[in-house]
Structure formats: C-alpha cells, structure tokens
Amino acid sequence: MSEKKEEVKNATVKVTVKLPKEDNHSHNTKHLKKTQSSKNNDISFEIGKESKIQTVLDVLAMIPSSKYLTNVGLKTIEGDSQLSDEMSIKEIVGEKSELKLQLILKPYSAREALKHVITVRDFIGFAQETSDGLSEFAISTGSSFSSLPLGPIKERSKQEEKDEKSDPEEKKNTFKDVTDEEKLKFNEMVHEVFSSFKNSSINKLLTSESNIITPCVRSLSFAPYNPVPPFYRSKGHLFYLQIVTLEGESFYITAIPSGFYVNKSNSTKFDPSPKENTDENAHSSLIYYSLFDLIASRSKKFISHVQAFEKKLSALDSTSYVRPSNTFLHKPWFVSSLPPNNPDYLRLQTAALDTTPERNFNDEFQAIKDLTTSTLQDRIEMERLFSKVVHEFSVTAASGAMSIFYSDFVAMNPESPTRDQIFLKDNIFYSYVSDVSGNYEGKGGDEAAIAASNQDLKTINILNRLHMHEVRYLLTTVVEFAGRRILAQTPVPGLLATMGNKIVKDANTGEEVTEDFVNDINVKYGLDEGLGKIVYDADFDSVLEKKFVKAFHLKKHKVNGTELAFSSQSKGIVGFDKRRYILDLANTYPLDINFARQNFDNIEETGNRYPHRQTLLRPELVEKWWNNKVEKEGVEFEKAYEENLFSYNPDAYQVEGIEDANVDEMSNYLQKEVIPSVIQDYLSGNLSTPYNGEHLADTLHKNGINMRYLGKIIELSQKELDSQIVHYEQNLKAVEQDNKEYEDWEKSYLQKIENMIKERQAKINKLVQEGKEVPKELTEDLKLNDEEIKKPTDGKPVVVAYDELVPLIKISELEIVSRSLKHVLKDLSKDVPVFLVPSLVAYVFNMLVGINYNADPKPEPVDEFYPVNKCSFAKLTRSELLEAVSKQAFLRFRHQLPSNWIEAYMENPFTLIRSVSYKFGIQLLNKEYFFTREQLESYKQSLDKKIRNKFVEPPTTFSLSDLTIIPRVKFSEYTSSVSEEFWAQGASMINEDKQSALTLLAQSITVLEDVNNILHPAVAEKYLSLSAIYNKLALYPEAIAFCRKACTIYERVSGIDSFEMMRALTNLAILEFSNESPYNATVVYNRLAEILKVYELPKIHHPAPTSIFNHLEQLALGVQDTKLAIEVLGQLSSYVVELEGKDSLAYGYTESRLGNLFAALKDFHRALEHITVTQGIFTKQLGMNHTHSAQSRQWVNGLSSLIMDLKQKKQLAQDQMSTTGSNSAGHKKTNHRQKKDDVKPELANKSVDELLTFIEGDSSNSKSKNKTNNKKKHGKK
C-alpha cells in the first residue's frame, strides 16, 4: 500500500493546449460572445504523468472553449505528426514538468461528422437527464431534491470553532449564529412539518419536476434527402441536416470533410450547394467547422437560450442533471405524467446511419481482462473499460430481450415451443429461463431453474471482483417482463459455430443425407450433458485450484469416480479463442440442507412443498460462517485462505450419497445463530429499523439471510414481542404489589418516627419540668438507621420494544404479501399475450383494493385479436385471488396469512401497490385514484363547478390506460478494487494522519467516479460514508456538501422513497443540525415527514417520527424558542397517545419535558398540570419508590408550594395597596412569619421524603429539576 501512496503523490504535469487560429474553422463573431465554441487562446490544466493523450482529449471535451471540437488530435508544438491517443504523457515529457500541445482539426468522415452532430445535440439540450439505456421501455423522472428550498451551507468561522472547543456544553444547548430571518423561516417550516405528518399525499410527494435540460433549437435531424446521391457523395458530401430554430426558421445543412454549411434546399427542392449569406456581417467563408457556430450565426435566440441553459446548469450540482453511463436511472412506480414524445427523427435515423461494426461483447470483455495492470493508471483504465462493457452489455441485452418478448426476433428454432426457443443477435445468446434440459427434474423444474439463474448471477458478481486471468466466464444479464424471464449471455467462442457439413449415404436407405462435422468446442471439465457424464481435465483442474476454489472455499471431491473442484452441475469449456470458460455456476454455493429437509424432502404432499429444492445458502452467509470458523479456531486468516481450510463440498446433498459436515454446520449456523442474532441486533439498535421491504431485504441479505426466511423472522419477532408484553404485564402487577408494600412501610415508618419524636419530647418536657438541663443529644437530629430507610431506586424500566419489533413484523408481512402477489401475477400472465398484461394487472388491482369503489370490476379489452374474456384470468374471482396470495405466502415463506389479511392494506393501498409494482415491473400514472365512492364525491366537490360538470367518473379504480409494464433487469455488478484499496488505507490512518487520510479517501472517490461515473449507487454510498467521516472530524460544511451530493445521486438511481434516500436525508438533517442551520435541518425533516406519512410508517410504530419531533424540539431550544419547543412536544405527545395511550412511559416522559419547559417560561400552573400527569404514570409503571416517581412528587409539591407562595405574595401586594407604608411593612413582616409557620404541617401527615428533608435539613432538592431518562424511544411502554 505504501507504493500506492507514492503513486497518489505522483508528480503532475502542466499541459497547455493551443487552439486553432481564427479562420473558416472558428468564427469569432460578435453574436457568439462567451459561448463561442473555440477562441484563439490557450487552455492550461494539471494532469498526472501516467495519464494518456486520450485523457487530455477527454478534458478538452468538457471545457467550454473546446467542447464543440470533436474530431481533433494533438501534436507537440515542435513536432509535425499527431500523437497517438494511447501514448502516455510521461513518454513525451520525460522529467519535464510542462507540456505544450497544439490542437489539430481533422477532416470529417461521415462517422466523425455524425459523432459531432450527436455531441452538439447533447450540449444544446437534446440529451435529457431522464434518459438512459432503458428509456425505450420505462420512464425515469428528474431530481426533486435540487428544488428543496435549502439555504446555502453555512461556513463556520474560526471564532465559532474556537468557542465550540472551549465551551462544548454551551454549543450543545444554543446556536450562536442564527439570524432573526432564519428563526422566522425555521418557525414556519416546523409548522409545515406538523402539516406534512397529517396531510401529505402520494400525488404531491411523487410529482417530479420538469426536465432541467431542454433543447435550444426546435429540431435537429437528418434531412429527408439522405442518403447522399452518388453524384454528390463522390464530391465529399457526407449527409444533410435539417434544423428548425426557436424563431421558427427552417434551413438545410450540408456536411462535408471541412465542416458544415447552409445549402439551398427547402422542403420541396433539393439543392445541396452553399447558400449565399446576404447579412452585412456575413463572413468570407460559409463553412463552419463546428455545427454549434453555424446555428449561432443563424439564430439570435439560440445564443440567449444557450447562455440561460448553461447558467441554469452552473447553479446546480452536476449530479442533478448528468446522464448515467454505467448504471440505470431509477424507474419510479408512480410517474407524474407521460413523457412528451416530441418529434425527433434523429433518434431513429442515427441507428440507420451508424457505421459502427457489430459488437462482440465477449471479445471486448476478455480483451479487457487481458490488459496489462502493471501501473496504477493501467489498473484504473482496465476497471473503467470493464465497468463500461459490463453495463453496455446489460443495455444491449435488455433491448434484445424486450424484442423477444414482443416477438420481434425470429428464434433459431422457431418450431419449438416458446419456452424452448433460443435466440442469437449481436453476438448475445438469449434463452427463456426454464428447465428445458431437465436438470432440475424432481427439484422444482422451472422454479428451480429461475432460482438458479439468480444464483448464477451472484457467482458472476463475485468473479467480477476476483480478476482471474486464467479462468474466464460469460457476461450475463437476466431480464424479467410481464411474467416471463430471459437469460442473456455472451456465448463461448465457437460453441454455437457450425464446422461445416458433408454428404453421406444413409446405411439403411442408401439415400444421401447432410451430416454436420463435430464441433470440437465441447465440455472439457465438469458436466457434459451430451455425453451424460462428468469429464475431467488436469489443466483445467489445476487452474481452478489456484484462485477459484480458495475464493469460494470449495472442497475437491469425487462424483461417480471423477475428481472435481466445483459443482457437478458446472461446466468447463476451452473456447475457440483457447481461453478456459466456466459456465452454469449456480451450485457453487452449498445447499441449505435444513430448509430443504424441513420444507421439501420431508413434505409428502406436493402442494405444500416449497416450490423448489434449489435452496442454496447466500455467499454472505458462507463468508460469515468461514470468518467465524477462522476466528473460533484461532487460525491466521492468510493461512486459512491459502490452505483452503474450512472448505465445503458443493455437491453435498445435491448428489445422492455425498454429505458434508460443514454444509450441515452452515445450515445450522444460519437458523440457530444468524437469524436470532439479527433480530437481537434490531432490538439493540445495531441495525436500523427498516423503512420498507427493500431496506429489510438489503439488511437480511448483507447478513446472509434468504428472503424465504421472512416467515421465520416474523415468528421469532412475534415470539419476542409476546414475551416482552407478558413480562411487561407481570411487572405492572409486581409494581402494584411493591407500591402497596411501600405504602404500608411508609405508614409504619412514619408512625415509628412520630413515636420517637413523642418519646423525645416527653423526655425534654420532663427535664424542663424538673429544671434540669436538656442534653445535647435530645436537641440534635434523630439518629435513624439507614438500613431501615427505603431510598429511591433507579431501576431500569420494563418496556416493550414496539419501535423495533412492530415495524419489523409489519414490513416483513408486507414483503411476504407483495412477493406472493408478484408470483400470482407471474403465474397469471406468463401465458397471456404481452399486450394484455396491463389489463390483467388493472383487473387484479381493482379486485384487490378497488372493490369498495366498484364491487364487480371487469377486465378491459385491449385488441380485437386478443379477446380478454377468453383468457383464464377474466374468470378469476376476488376470493380465489386472495386465496392464491395466501397459498404463495405459505409455500414460499412458510407463513400463514390471516383470512382477512387484505384489510390491513385497504386504508392505504398504495403501500402494497408500491411494493408489488417494484417487484413485478409496473408504473402507474400519478393521478387521483378513488378507492371508495366517498373519495370520489369528495374529489368532485373540490373541483371548480365548470370542471365538475365535465368530469367523467371512472368505472373502476384502475384502468389499463393508467399503467404500463416495464422490464426488471438483473445485471452483474462491478466496483473498483483500486478505489476500495485507497479507501481502506485512508480509513485506517484517519486518526494518525488526518490530512493524508482525507486525501486518500478523496482519491478513492475520484477513481470510483472515473470507473463507474459519478451517477452510480456505489459513488453515492462513498459520499455518504465520507460525509460521516467529516462529521466525526467536526468539518460540518464539507460533510453537508458530500451528503447533499449523495442525496441527489440516490434520488436519481434509487428513488425519492427509497431507503437509501431516507437514510441519506436523515444523515443530512443531523449534519445541518450540527452546523447550526435549524432551517435547513427542518426542510430536510419536512421531506422525511412527507415520505413517512404517505407510506403510513407512523401507524406501524416506526421510530423515525419521534426522532424527528425530538430533534425539532432541540432545534427550537437551540434558537431559544421555548414556545415552539412546547408546540413540538405537544405534537409528539398527541402522537404517543394515539399509539400507546396515556398510561405509557413515553407519554410520561413527554409530559415531564413539557412541564420543565412551562416552568422555564414561569407558567407554573401549566407546568403543574403536566408534572401531575407524570406522577400517576411513573408510580404505576416504575413504582412509588423509583427516582422518577420521587422527583415527580417533589416537583408537584414544590410547584404547588411555589404557586401558593406567589399567590400569597400577590395577595400581600394587593393588601399593601390599601394600607399605609408603615403598616404595610409591619404586615409584611408578620405575614412572612406566618408563612414560615404555615408550611410546617404535622409530621405525621408528611411523606417519608418530606420527613427526611425536614429532619436532615436538606432543602436543596425542593426544587430539583425533573431530569427524566429520555434514552428510550417513544415506542416503549
């Protein structure tokens, strides 16, 4: 790692690039001003010596003065020849620290001119930020985070930092640098949060902003006069364009090697010759090297729009509008509106004119893996290309799969049934995921094959990180659409090729027949399905042993006498390119044998079995178990890895007669240790309470738990909850008994003290009567036995972990229901024509949750060629649908849903619909949906009278016109190992060398952005982590900037309502709090409140709402607005009462805090009201002798006395007004003595606490502040 650190500090070179002089290639006209594409100046920047010339060109492609020059090269100032793009800077400069280069304009070819046109289009607003590789099949929405009314990040002054260090306690309590204007805005925003918790709607939350990027011309496309006629093609004409400016002018352009010019063509006449410019300011040359300059010369509005456009972008973080290159944008389930499908011929035309040769993704992928990685720059370049080709394969595969789903491809075997058909296009092999070969017969058939395709992809994800050169694998993507699933893979080179054929005579008939030559590309190692046996190859075996076996902890074993290093279902093939490929890697992981036995093997009735036996353990579980074994056995990690200790046999319990104790142990480890420990982690707060099903799945998967254990999660969580409730109720009874005992003890102890006092007084009286001196011991305090006194206890309250367990149970149930419903939809739709699936989905949704609006919904017709009423789903009844969901819930999750399970989702159906939509692939239109007739009538009354009269009532809640079906793409993932290494080193040295550590962390993110592009989930995760590190270092402004960037990325790639976004928003709010920006923090809390409300998380006891209220109270106190803090606690108190009632400890704690705040305002009557409430709660829940109960009594007594004292003083002041000054003074004196006498009631009537105070002379606690233990969250009882 020290070498890497040196490479980070590698010397940079100052590069100066001289742009071309003004001539016909660059028109420095008045109208171009600052937006001209190239100026007669130099561009300078720093770049690493290890960088290549291509990197310099990449930088120039983003600089305003050169970004419109796309067909260029570079040469040194002294040299004549163009430098190779792959040449490194170091090769050119040697030991020098400066490099001067000249930009060379190259003549256009049709290909380069097309590239230039597309680049210009992108820069002038045709490349919308909502487009990605799936835009043809699904809708993405823009960012709304950038429209949040957040103020600028507050910079901390050195004096503030100094004050914070010198007086951290003061810093914690109050904010020093908050203006009156911000306080006012903060107050208003707090009230918006209150409103959001009550009135937020799904329609408002998921209304996306209009696109940030909009075109600066009306249209730019190829003219209908293409292709170029032969007469002009030979004269250099490349193609013709047609442009319509914002002024409405339409003109035609000819592209030639030296650039572009306006020609004489119009809509009815073709004349590609140059059109003379009659403008007085016209230039001598009519040819523009840059298309941008040509448009600018013809349109004044174009320049102003480009300036406004660039100004708008400059005000935003680039993450809010940059297009993704290595990932897909989030596809929300609720889309604001259908995207405008404006005429843009170029979208279709570019495909026709594209001269790029057909890609061979496998060749590209394998060539990238062969690249040299001797230097850091080489490694980064390899990873960048790797990530790029993996994503581009997924895009192409998804597009190809969709063509198959829509029957636009012809199969290689068209006569076969649909599920057996295979396809080959663009060197990608497609097949429906089913058990065509019969490998999973007896194990679940198609269901097992579907599970195996997911498991195969998991293996490939791990292989992506291993960088094995001697073992190769295939690019793989899985596409699901409308209940169907297609597997797309790059084929092994030569495997599908025909080796030619020969004509031979049939031995029986004598007829001549054609016979194919045998393909010599076949299985060398593992399962040969053609031969029906396991084959062995020593070379293949030795290669697998080097890294593959160790990485997966596989044990070498024998199957039918043949030795194998991996599963007997996997294959090893030597391709035509002589590389070794491994395929069918699903069974690389061990079987979860306990689950298989319990839910498949030992279930005699097939209908109650788990759908398949392909129940493998997750890779995270295997790693967790292996690391646990290494630690328990006390073996060094390196030794365990190199010697392949604690390995397992992947064929154990898969092949008859093969067993493995480690496989049994892993299965036991999952069920008996991991699952219970995860529930305990939720209880202890080590794991965040899930926001939604995706959050839960992410947490379970990271801990190695399969989703088939959701039923087990609910079972254990409910058992824990029931146990806690029983314990809580038992404790209440015990407290009640303790209170009785305490009252009895108090009464007897008071009586004892009174007797002691009487005895002492009798002795004193006797001595006085006898005229004797009273001994000192009779005038001193009573000597009491401390052991007899029951002092207040501070025992831990017995609470029920509702906050942790109820959301876990409810979200697990929601996930079971939505996943079960997804399987029902898949079963219903897999044999239905694709075009009918929207009708099917609308029908199912109407039956599920629209029954109170229309009790008898019917499926809508789509096309007369596909009559809906003849489909099986049209005969489905609601009871059958509900029963089908319940059956899937039991089969797949071993969980029995209650008979009325649907009722839980009828009040807010969108919670269920959202979850199902993400899983099946559904996008709904953002509009008003009516689930009851009352909702409809209410909506109609809210309309303007004119609109109401024209309003047409929808026949059902959902219509097929409200939704679309979209593909769900499962693709292999890749992350940069170089970035991870920089991050690990930076994180490890943060305490020793902060500056170097932060530099390494920043370098890690820079590398990751280079490899994956800035718009990527992995980049967002790193920014969020970096934000947390800066927060720990008290560098709050920087932490906020990083966290805001993470929020923007997460919103675009994960969604506004994703758990990643909610987690990032929560962090951001806390950071804004730490930076003393109460308004900004509250803006973020308001967005969180909206999300929490629309998905009804407050109703399932989620702790997030309470956390928000608690932070809002602290913010209010920070700006010293006690009245606002009281309002916040009032809202919290109402929320707690709604969830738990007025007997809960949470309510008592909140009332106690309210009492304190009212006391601070000197509103002692209100303070007494709230503190009095706590006395009964604490006594019932904690016991009379608990510290909180004792303090509450002291508060009540103290406040009561204080109120009485103030009342007496007020009365005294009134009396003084009616008397003379002297009498007043005398009266006051008498009254004061009277008060002293009055506040000493009979000792027998005092409580033990009061009595002790009296005897011991300790009055310091009479106004003790009730500091309640507020560590427990609101969900505790």
UniProtKB/Swiss-Prot annotation:
GO molecular function: mRNA binding; RNA binding
CDD domains: CLU-central (cd15466), UDM1_RNF168_RNF169-like (cd22249)
Start and end residues of each Clu domain: 339-596
Location of Phosphoserine modifications: 1247
Residue stretches of biased makeup (Basic residues): 27-36, 1264-1277
Main function: mRNA-binding protein involved in proper cytoplasmic distribution of mitochondria.
Protein name (record): Clustered mitochondria protein 1
Annotated source species: Saccharomyces cerevisiae (strain ATCC 204508 / S288c)
